[in-house]
């Protein structure tokens, strides 16, 4: 059983290394849609950047996906595609991998979100 948005029945997708994908699959995120397309992609050293980019674009177009989790090191390879995605849904969240820790300075989505808030609004 996959983790679904309670109201709409939407999915979380995962793009990342084998350990990341297996962890989320064990947590119940894995699904295959009616066209037999999974909601995850395992990326390894032999994965072409074009494959990664195509998968990300497919996930963006799927109406059953609300959140895309992507290892930050994978996101760096397709940064131009991620930066071009400005719609709030599906939300794109960059996550660390086992071998690559999270670096907030590389996360363009976090930078964009920070720009939406006035620092004085956060101080009380």
From Swiss-Prot:
Transmembrane segments: none annotated. InterPro entries: ATPase_V1-cplx_f_g_su, ATPase_V1-cplx_fsu_euk, ATPase_V1_fsu_sf. GO terms for biological process: proton transmembrane transport. Keywords: Hydrogen ion transport, Ion transport, Phosphoprotein, Transport. The keyword Glycoprotein does not apply. The modification Phosphoserine is found at residue 87. Disulfide bonds: none annotated. SUPFAM superfamilies: AtpF-like. Subunit of the V1 complex of vacuolar(H+)-ATPase (V-ATPase), a multisubunit enzyme composed of a peripheral complex (V1) that hydrolyzes ATP and a membrane integral complex (V0) that translocates protons. V-ATPase is responsible for acidifying and maintaining the pH of intracellular compartments and in some cell types, is targeted to the plasma membrane, where it is responsible for acidifying the extracellular environment. PANTHER family: V-TYPE PROTON ATPASE SUBUNIT F, VACUOLAR ATP SYNTHASE SUBUNIT F. V-ATPase is a heteromultimeric enzyme made up of two complexes: the ATP-hydrolytic V1 complex and the proton translocation V0 complex. The V1 complex consists of three catalytic AB heterodimers that form a heterohexamer, three peripheral stalks each consisting of EG heterodimers, one central rotor including subunits D and F, and the regulatory subunits C and H. The proton translocation complex V0 consists of the proton transport subunit a, a ring of proteolipid subunits c9c'', rotary subunit d, subunits e and f, and the accessory subunits VhaAC45 and ATP6AP2. This is V-type proton ATPase subunit F 1. It comes from Drosophila melanogaster.
């Amino acid at each position: 059983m996959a983790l679904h948005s309670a109201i709409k029945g939407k999915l979380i997708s995962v793009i990342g290394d084998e350990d990341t994908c297996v962890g989320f699959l064990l947590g119940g995120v894995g699904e295959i849609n009616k066209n037999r397309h999974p909601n995850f992609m395992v990326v390894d050293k032999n994965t072409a950047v074009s494959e990664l980019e195509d998968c990300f674009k497919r996930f963006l177009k799927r109406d059953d996906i609300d959140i895309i989790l992507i290892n930050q090191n994978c996101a760096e390879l397709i940064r131009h595609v991620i930066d071009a995605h400005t719609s709030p849904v599906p939300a794109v969240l960059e996550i660390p991998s086992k071998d690559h820790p999270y670096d907030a300075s590389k996360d363009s989505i976090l930078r964009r979100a920070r720009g939406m808030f006035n620092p004085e609004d956060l101080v009380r």
